[in-house]
Amino acid sequence: MVSQLTDAFARKFYYLRLSITDVCNFRCTYCLPDGYQANGTNPHRFLSLDEIRRVSRAFAELGTEKVRLTGGEPSLRRDFVDIIAAIRENPAIRTLAVTTNGYRLARDVAQWRDAGLTALNVSVDSLDARQFHAITGQDKFRQVMDGIDAAFDCGFAKVKVNTVLMRDVNAGSLQTFLDWIKHRPIQLRFIELMETGEGGELFRRHHVSGEVIRQQLLQQGWQQQQRARSDGPAQVFCHPDYEGEIGLIMPYEKDFCLSCNRLRVSAIGNLHLCLFGEQGIPLRDLLADDRHLNDLKMRISGGLSTKKQTHFLHEGNSGITQNLSFIGG
């Protein structure tokens, strides 16, 4: 049995972000502005259900407590419910989450919960339907809002909403978002726009620091909360007058990487030690058969020896991440 995943800087890893597809049906300006472009290779190139079962088991036995399914849009997988159920076979995984654009939420969220999904993040970059359409390329604002309501109706106590913070788009809309979460158990997370290989011009035009939002929150009496060991990187704030919470994810902030607790596996089976790192470590040759489980765990744990102390975003180096659908953000 390999001990808890730990790197050379004594960081422990409890959280796996597992991409199950690169495909997305939205065309968000900061991610896939031209829509998903198939690369013409094998349509079965994404991890199969059995491969997902094996990789999740390996991580569970290495101390992983939380798995987040990402994409692309994970719910476009026809076997998405089966994937949820397969990962929930691991009792060590206490939290199983998905990040979704909300397109299929209203229709399917009850099935996801029944299969074992425990947490939900929905991407909503604007509360104005026309602006939502302009950002995503899809006139689906009402459908996504109905999906969030459906999540509450089927038993989710809280929903997280991801909002990419952009100058001249939504950075001046804090009060609108605060009004929305005042009586809703939503954790609204502002995520700083990150530079990717394909998004340099957009980054220069729209990047704004989350510090702007933090100062406004502190001035209005919001209090920062402690983070659990398997939580993501958000700084979370609460206020006694609000049912909802605000999260801030600021990857350009000093020491952002000090508390890194997460690893990534891409939809084609490569282990990525950082969202903005270089080429991943291939795992797929060890996912074909249950007999390779111990070798798989050794490759995962051994790979951590090469994890860098920090990303290099401040230097304009986004590694191999051409867009955020590639590894799953």
UniProtKB/Swiss-Prot annotation:
Pfam families in alphabetical order: Fer4_12, Mob_synth_C, Radical_SAM
Record InterPro entries: Aldolase_TIM (IPR013785), Elp3/MiaA/NifB-like_rSAM (IPR006638), MoaA (IPR013483), MoaA_NifB_PqqE_Fe-S-bd_CS (IPR000385), MoaA_twitch (IPR010505), MoCo_biosynth_MoaA/MoaC (IPR050105), rSAM (IPR007197)
Cofactor binding remark: Binds 2 [4Fe-4S] clusters. Binds 1 [4Fe-4S] cluster coordinated with 3 cysteines and an exchangeable S-adenosyl-L-methionine and 1 [4Fe-4S] cluster coordinated with 3 cysteines and the GTP-derived substrate.
GO biological process: Mo-molybdopterin cofactor biosynthetic process
UniProt: [4Fe-4S] cluster 1 binding residues: C24, C28, C31
Cofactors: [4Fe-4S] cluster
Pathway(s) where this gene product acts: Cofactor biosynthesis; molybdopterin biosynthesis
E.C. code: 4.1.99.22
Keyword annotations: 4Fe-4S, GTP-binding, Iron, Iron-sulfur, Lyase, Metal-binding, Molybdenum cofactor biosynthesis, Nucleotide-binding, S-adenosyl-L-methionine
Domain Radical SAM core: 8-234
Residues reported in the UniProt entry to bind GTP: R17, R68, T99, K160, R262, L263, R264
Catalysed conversion reaction: GTP + AH2 + S-adenosyl-L-methionine = (8S)-3',8-cyclo-7,8-dihydroguanosine 5'-triphosphate + 5'-deoxyadenosine + L-methionine + A + H(+)
Gene3D superfamilies: Aldolase class I
Binding residue positions for [4Fe-4S] cluster 2: C257, C260, C274
Domain of life: Bacteria
Binding site for S-adenosyl-L-methionine: Y30, G72, S123, M194
GO molecular function: 4 iron, 4 sulfur cluster binding; cyclic pyranopterin monophosphate synthase activity; GTP 3',8'-cyclase activity; GTP binding; metal ion binding; S-adenosyl-L-methionine binding
Subunit note: Monomer and homodimer.
Function: Catalyzes the cyclization of GTP to (8S)-3',8-cyclo-7,8-dihydroguanosine 5'-triphosphate.
Family: Belongs to the radical SAM superfamily. MoaA family.
Descriptive protein name: GTP 3',8-cyclase
